[in-house]
Structure formats: structure tokens, C-alpha cells
From Swiss-Prot:
Biological processes per GO annotation: neuropeptide signaling pathway
Protein name as annotated: FMRFamide
Native species: Macrocallista nimbosa (Sun-ray clam)
Function: Myoactive; cardioexcitatory substance. Pharmacological activities include augmentation, induction, and regularization of cardiac contraction.
Keywords of this entry: Amidation, Neuropeptide, Secreted
Cell compartments where the protein resides: Secreted
Family: Belongs to the FARP (FMRFamide related peptide) family.
Modified residues (Phenylalanine amide): 4
Length: 4
């Protein structure tokens, strides 16, 4: 989520 935050990494994508």
C-alpha cells in the first residue's frame, strides 16, 4: 500500500 504505502510502498506501492
Amino acid at each position: 500500500f504505502m510502498r506501492f
